[in-house]
A protein has these predicted regions:
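Short glycine-cluster motifs
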Residues: 74-103
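Short loop/turn elements that form and flank the Walker-type P-loop nucleotide-binding site
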Residues: 1-2, 49, 73-75, 101
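Short alpha-helical
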Residues: 38-39, 63, 87, 95
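Glycine-rich, flexible N-terminal cofactor/catalytic loop recognition
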Residues: 1-59
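Short glycine-/acidic-enriched loop or helix-start segments at secondary-structure transitions
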Residues: 17-18, 43-44, 65, 89-92
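Glycine-rich, highly charged phosphate/nucleotide-binding loops
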Residues: 60-68
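Short, glycine/charged-enriched secondary-structure capping and boundary segments
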Residues: 21-24, 46-49, 68-70, 92-97
Length: 103
């Protein structure tokens, strides 16, 4: 797989608790996969991040996961974010990481 998946931790409370590295990653990737785009758009707008975003959540994790893995196979770099915190802890991120390992 030539593309990469970035697991990006987002602030639990104050939006300004995000790291510079995560902000740079969110601006540089080809696509952001967000657990809840309605919440994540607030973060992206606050920091003027214009990267395209798609939903990736509990109810579409298998189908959307396959789409995201295929995009990475084609060279796309994707950032995975959750509503708050680190992907893979109490959210569908674990499933996408597993799919990437199997690809």
């Amino acid at each position: 797989m030539s593309g990469k998946l970035y697991l990006c931790a987002t602030p639990i409370g104050n939006l300004e608790d995000i790291t510079f590295r995560v902000l740079r990653t969110l601006k540089e990737v080809d696509l952001i996969a967000a657990e809840d785009t309605r919440n994540s758009i607030k973060l992206l707008n606050h920091f003027e991040i214009k990267t395209p975003m798609t939903s990736y959540h509990e109810y579409n994790k298998i189908d959307k996961g396959m789409v995201l893995v295929e995009k990475m196979r084609q060279g796309a770099n994707i950032a995975l974010i959750t509503d708050a915190g680190t992907p893979g802890i109490s959210d569908p991120g674990e499933e996408l990481v597993s799919m990437c390992h199997q690809a």
